[in-house]
């Protein structure tokens, strides 16, 4: 078959599609333009376009496929099996809490098969466990670009966003995940945690988040932040919930006696009692005993708030 006959058959096939196909008017116009462009480009005369030549072209192609079947790429099949093996090893590493090893294994699986949404979702879970939340967001979004209905990816995205302080985005992610998996308890708990954070006053949330970050890094909490950065009077101190809560804990734990044995603290107290004015709060904030006490106080408060660490992390697939 000459090239002109093939071209003419293609034009006939397009014209048949226009008249017999269930296509919209806009699509018909596009096919008409395409057929005319091909005819003009190859200088095909109208009499060269034989009726039903398009059908014969399709039949010839189908016959060729029967005689020359496309063989499955065995190498690709083997590679996918290797990627699945790496994924399973990564899942085992997650179960053993070896998150860095899991991350490395998922990365190798992605290098072999970058089209699997599950690998990105699982690596997002590993990133979350390692505290690399920006990377977790990126992997979760990549997974969702490959599979928009992947509920677990929404959970991992929600946890990363919540850990980054974006409670609104976290709540949105958890809600979308629940649209596809309404009975998922992890997503439900994650949404509850995100809504709880959204309902907290913004200033106290920011202060709490900063204090937790400093405490988790091993640094002393900022005692000065309790006083709002200024030098308060005694009345405002007594009305400050954070100060009163700390005072109650001091008295209940018996730690107040240890503090008063510190010569610097005792001297400040005597000076205040004798009319020497308010003590230097900057010095108080830098006192090692007070810093250590505040750190322990904050850690005790945080012990009851560990649910967020488990949000969005069901077992990997």
Curated annotation (Swiss-Prot):
Keywords per UniProt: Chaperone, Cytoplasm, Nucleus, Repeat, TPR repeat
SUPFAM superfamilies: TPR-like (SSF48452)
Top-level taxon in the UniProt lineage: Eukaryota
Key word Chaperone present: yes
Pfam families: SGTA_dimer (PF16546), TPR_17 (PF13431), TPR_8 (PF13181)
GO cellular component: cytosol; membrane; nucleus; TRC complex
TPR repeats: from-to residues: 14-48, 83-116, 118-150, 151-184
Gene Ontology molecular function: membrane insertase activity; molecular adaptor activity
GO biological process, one term: post-translational protein targeting to endoplasmic reticulum membrane
Chain segments carrying region Disordered: 198-224, 298-317
Intracellular or extracellular location(s): Cytoplasm; Nucleus
Biased composition (Polar residues): 198-215
Statement: the UniProt record of this protein carries the keyword Transcription regulation: no
Function text: Co-chaperone that binds to the molecular chaperone Hsp70 and regulates Hsp70 ATPase activity.
Protein family membership: Belongs to the SGT family.
Protein name: Small glutamine-rich tetratricopeptide repeat-containing protein 2
